[in-house]
Amino acid sequence: MFVKKDDLLSMLISFIYEKKVYVTSVNSITKYKILGFTVVKHIKSDTYVRNVFFKIFRTTRYFTEQEQSLDFSSRHFDVVDLSMDQDKKPLVSVIVPNYNHAPYLKERLDSIYQQTYQNIEVILLDDFSSDNSVEVLKQYARKYPHNTRLIVNEENSGKVFRQWNKGLSLAKGELIWIAESDDYCDVNFLDEVVKAFVHQSVMLSFAHSVFMQDGKKIWTLEQYLHDLPVSFESSFIMPAHTIVNEAFAIKNIVPNVSSAVFRNVGAISDEVTTLWEKMSLCGDWLFYLWLIKGGTISYTNKVNNYYRIHSKSTSLRIQRTLDYSTVSR
């Protein structure tokens, strides 16, 4: 589909001037397959905004030789990462996909509702559980009616990623946290993880994970990622292309989605959802790589996400990875 230059320009100017990711703008951009970058330029002159952004899309035929020069561009743009209001508390949509995790729900939900960061909406999704999960979820929905929605499927969806997509379609927040129903976290988890989004280039921020089994710590994120050249001993913000080359292309450095918060970019690309339908494993890895493209990724070691390993874990590939790594050492 052809997009008029002026229409695209209007979207980009709105995107930048408001200094936030508007779902409507990003949806429009996604539809035209050009969400391959993150805005990190502060406009000094909107007259030549297309000089930078259309060059990114390789449509330099629209510009004169003078307009394409680096000197000309530098006089109209500052290359900086736009920062949001330090006091801003963006709404976080917390999506809790559940299937037969009744024994873990209380600890999970308490760790959400007791967060020190309180600007949240909670979307509880039950995928036709056969245990008493729905009763537990209803108790919390009644206890926190002001910021909770409960959706119970009448039949099982067959794939956890379909539940993710349903939650994303319902989310109103600027940020998304998919908090799996069998995990839990520190009460200041959101406070620390959300801080990174003051930087407009950050597309995903994740926390340190501790792997739990039968109530005991069995591994840490550092142990899981010990064979990568990137250090997870301290917090960082890193360009996506750098961390993909050094780590993300080798191993999924976000082993559990509960440890991550990401920007709400609206509808997920058909390219991703089509692959999701074919995948029983690694769909989260694919999603992260699509999401962070062109931006930066943040990691904090100041708070913990507790990833529970058990027979009904959403993904057992981590358990296989742990077993293999233990044997191979």
Segments and roles (model prediction):
Residues E180-Y184, H208:
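The conserved acidic donor/metal-binding loop of glycosyltransferases
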Residues N153-A171:
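Glycine-rich, basic loop-to-helix element that forms the pyrophosphate-binding segment
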Residues H226-S328:
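Conserved nucleotide-sugar donor-binding catalytic segment
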Residues P90-S93, E121, L286:
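Cell-envelope/extracellular polymer assembly enzymes that use nucleotide-activated donors
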Residues I176:
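Short aromatic/hydrophobic "clamp" motif used to bind/position activated sugar donors
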Residues L109-V152:
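Acidic donor-binding segment of Leloir-type glycosyltransferases
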Residues N188-L228:
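Conserved donor NDP-sugar-binding/catalytic core segment of glycosyltransferases
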Residues I56-S111:
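N-proximal low-complexity "stem/linker" segments adjacent to membrane-targeting elements
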